[in-house]
Amino acid sequence: MKMIGFEKPFKLEEGNLFKVYEQRKPTPENDDILVKVNSISVNPVDTKQRQMEVTQAPRVLGFDAIGTVEAIGPDVTLFSPGDVVFYAGSPNRQGSNATYQLVSEAIVAKAPHNISANEAVSLPLTGITAYETFFDTFKISHNPAENEGKSVLIINGAGGVGSIATQIAKRYGLTVITTASRQETTEWCEKMGADIVLNHKEDLVRQFKEKEIPLVDYIFCTYNTDLYYNTMIELIKPLGHITTIVAFNEDQDLNALKLKSITFTHEFMFARPIHRTPDMIKQHEYLEDITKNIESGHYQPTTTQVFEGLSPENLYQAHQLLEKQSMIGKLVINI
């Protein structure tokens, strides 16, 4: 099998340190399945992981993947060889930048039948992230009627997470306010289903007042938590809930949350697979719901760019594009 990896952490300005490696196909054990990978999607987390300590070289990155089950471990009950599946993997295992990958069945689901592999692979990591935010953290109802009248502000609505989060929120009955700044990102947010799109290059509090937008029940921050921290506190309702996927880089005053009794949560979709939590199967269930909603026409894929061929050059270029922080939707590599 072929893998694209690296020996040591590196920044892009050091040059392209991705290399091709070959090894024998692994044999699945326990609840693992062996997947022949067809397509992968590259995420911002890949660029962060590339710069972290390498404990076992070569380090093979990659999270989103779609492919065909080739073999199963003795404890596998959900899949059979030949099934086409998609998943987001785990950072404590070798990733999907490879022609074959081992992954636990608990974080895998059968892929949608009505869209292409390059489209479907845009959904697992961002979709699970959004599902965990809405259903585990915000605890919205699975009955859309029970969520009517509630609203969410999604900061950076045109990114990979924001794109699918908007669709999920609309599917389950929330009013969705997102942010963007360019014409093309604003139009993308509207295409994803946003009710209101605000300009995040301008004062959001002022825009809320000018447009007479009520304070929101939930805020989902997918970009620069430090920059928006105080703004989010102003725009959330009393007893509201803020969730971010972006770590703080500066010290922030947690006491500022007290006056409104705001709940603040970090979302990290890899927490379940890294720690093999007892409820890890939820990621399988969330992916199943994504497949159901894609096949019923409620969701659309978020792929906007496709590279042909798994190579060090394509992977390096993908990381370059993501580090510019101007991507709309998702970038895919067709293996």
From Swiss-Prot:
Pfam families: ADH_N, ADH_zinc_N. PROSITE patterns: QOR_ZETA_CRYSTAL. SMART domains: PKS_ER. The keyword Metal-binding applies. Coiled coil: none annotated. It comes from the Bacteria. Gene3D superfamilies: Medium-chain alcohol dehydrogenases, catalytic domain, NAD(P)-binding Rossmann-like Domain. Belongs to the zinc-containing alcohol dehydrogenase family. Quinone oxidoreductase subfamily. InterPro entries: ADH-like_C, ADH-like_N, ADH_Zn_typ-1, GroES-like_sf, NAD(P)-bd_dom_sf, PKS_ER, Quin_OxRdtase/zeta-crystal_CS, YIM1/Zinc_Alcohol_DH_Fams. This is Zinc-type alcohol dehydrogenase-like protein SAS2087. NCBIfam families: adh_fam_1. One of its GO terms (molecular function) is oxidoreductase activity. Keywords: Metal-binding, Oxidoreductase, Zinc.
